[in-house]
């Protein structure tokens, strides 16, 4: 009923739900998001993350930003950091630095308060990548077998993620015009509006074709992937794609180290390197800005690492 009501609201057939209006976003945060969207090409999921941190800072320290002090900004971050883990703290630091630099650019205060944001202890590339084995990938794909729209869609999503290493937002944003059947390629527009055309593997193309043959033709969107329940709208963000992966992992009874779509991106990257794809070529497919990011996945090939490991010298007492 909720989906049907939203559909009627979107069509203007019935009024929206009554109730208290959500708190409005501060004008400075709106201007901040607009600037980053226009000048930096930042996508909506990242902007929402930035906006949460900026809004929290404004409501804590007050909107009279020219009165802010470095110590107050630092105390705000340290308090929030004590309530969450390292990844969340790192995301908050990125948001706050971007917002404070924007305010400085606008001349809202003198000095650069972004310098007051401390760094969080983090050793780059210190963790092993989280990925699935080849057998687990096969089980995951098999868990999407079926002829109904949802299973065909899930299979196409899983294969697109695990074969091409796309991000969840990339998959959610795919349009029908991004698929070039004649050349067998897929155009992807990723972070910073960076465009790349990737070769379409046979199994991915077959899965997409089977899904599109069953996809409702009368829906008002050119997005490739849509929700299976009427009115079959596109995914609002990559979270919907990650939800598809999460449910498929559960059906396959796979106890994965992570549950979202990024697990399959890690798996694709690791598999490329295991099969001898050079780092620079794997980085092009994954659209990494630095080869160091791609090298992170080389650590997952334990068999290869054993071949180059040096014997530990014996020490005579």
Q: Where would I find each of the regions flagged by the language model?
A:
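Conserved catalytic core of the tyrosine transesterase superfamily
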Residues: 1-317
């Amino acid at each position: 009923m909720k989906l049907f009501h939203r559909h009627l609201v979107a069509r203007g057939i019935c009024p929206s739900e009554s109730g208290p209006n959500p708190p409005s976003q501060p004008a400075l945060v709106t201007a901040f998001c607009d600037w980053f969207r226009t000048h930096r090409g930042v996508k909506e999921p990242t902007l929402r993350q930035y906006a949460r941190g900026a809004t929290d800072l404004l409501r804590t320290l007050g909107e009279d930003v020219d009165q802010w002090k470095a110590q107050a900004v630092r105390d705000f971050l340290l308090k929030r950091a004590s309530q969450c883990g390292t990844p969340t703290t790192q995301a908050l630091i990125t948001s706050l630095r971007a917002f404070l630099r924007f305010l400085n650019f606008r001349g809202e205060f003198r000095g650069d308060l972004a310098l007051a944001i401390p760094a969080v202890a983090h050793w780059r590339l210190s963790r092993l990548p989280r990925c699935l084995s080849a057998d687990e990938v096969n089980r995951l794909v098999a868990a999407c077998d079926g002829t109904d729209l949802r299973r065909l869609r899930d299979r196409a999503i899983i294969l697109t993620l695990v074969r091409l290493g796309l991000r969840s937002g990339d998959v959610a944003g795919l349009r029908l015009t991004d698929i070039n059947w004649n050349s067998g390629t897929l155009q992807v527009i990723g972070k910073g509006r960076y465009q790349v055309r990737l070769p379409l593997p046979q199994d991915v193309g077959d899965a997409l074709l089977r899904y599109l043959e069953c996809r409702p033709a009368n829906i008002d969107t050119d997005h490739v992937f849509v929700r299976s329940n009427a009115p079959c709208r596109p995914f609002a963000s990559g979270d919907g794609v990650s939800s598809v992966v999460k449910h498929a992992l559960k059906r396959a009874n796979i106890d994965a180290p992570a549950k979202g779509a990024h697990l399959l991106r890690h798996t694709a990257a690791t598999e490329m390197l295991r099969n001898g794809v050079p780092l620079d070529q794997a980085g092009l497919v994954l659209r990494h800005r630095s080869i160091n990011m791609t090298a992170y996945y080389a650590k997952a090939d334990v068999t290869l690492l054993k071949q180059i490991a040096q014997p530990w010298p014996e020490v005579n007492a």
